[in-house]
């Protein structure tokens, strides 16, 4: 018994093997949809990775700046000759000036023993000035808030009464900003 061959209505023998144009177009549409959804997922993944990377970078920068500020601030008032060096000269919400006698000669050298940390209005750069000009410490600073405490722990604005400084830094771009805080107690005060 011979296999039956299919014929179209005009009597022409129809092909039974291969793909038609419709099959090819359907496969192309399905493949394109899969590619588009894959591209969308890759794009979302890239955005999430960039956001996380920016946040980690902001956190590392903020920690570095905070550690540097607090470490230097703890040295404020260092006066081995007991010459009466005032530890804090300026105590403002976004500017702090302090000094220490690192070489022990009884005189504060303004080019290396007097330090200013500041965030200028309208800028997003935390700067440190130790006599050589205000050099950038970190960028993308959204906020620097300095608050000062006296011996009893009460807030003060008098530089002569400062015994501790609370430092709050907000660093990073909108949506990935990081806030770090610490309190540095001045170790070299005469009670």
Give residue spans per PLM region.
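Generic detector of solvent-exposed, compositionally biased contiguous segments
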Residues: 64-86, 135-152
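Short, glycine/small-hydrophobic-rich surface segments
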Residues: 50, 57, 73-100
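Short linear sequence signals and composition-biased patches located at protein termini or domain-edge surfaces
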Residues: 2-8, 47, 57, 102, ...
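Aliphatic-rich helix starts adjacent to a transmembrane/signal segment
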Residues: 2-4, 17-78
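Residues that act as N-cap/strand-start positions at coil-to-secondary-structure junctions
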Residues: 82, 109-113, 178
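Type IV pilin-like appendage domain
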Residues: 89-154
């Amino acid at each position: 018994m011979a296999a039956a061959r299919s014929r179209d209505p005009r009597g022409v023998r129809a092909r039974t093997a291969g793909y038609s144009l419709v099959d090819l177009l359907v496969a192309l549409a399905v493949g394109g949809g899969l590619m588009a959804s894959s591209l969308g997922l890759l794009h979302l993944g890239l955005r999430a990775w960039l956001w996380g990377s920016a946040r980690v970078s902001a956190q590392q920068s903020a920690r570095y700046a905070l550690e540097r500020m607090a470490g230097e601030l703890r040295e404020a008032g260092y006066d081995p000759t007991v010459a009466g060096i005032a530890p804090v000269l300026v105590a403002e919400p976004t500017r702090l000036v302090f000094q220490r006698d690192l070489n022990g000669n009884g005189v504060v050298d303004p080019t290396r023993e007097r330090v200013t940390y500041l965030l200028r209005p309208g800028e997003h750069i935390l700067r440190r000035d130790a006599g050589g000009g205000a050099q950038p410490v970190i960028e993308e600073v959204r906020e620097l808030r300095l608050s000062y405490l006296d011996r009893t722990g009460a807030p003060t604005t008098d530089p002569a009464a400062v015994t501790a400084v609370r430092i709050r830094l907000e660093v990073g771009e909108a949506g990935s900003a990081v806030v770090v805080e610490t309190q540095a107690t001045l170790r070299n005060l005469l009670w």
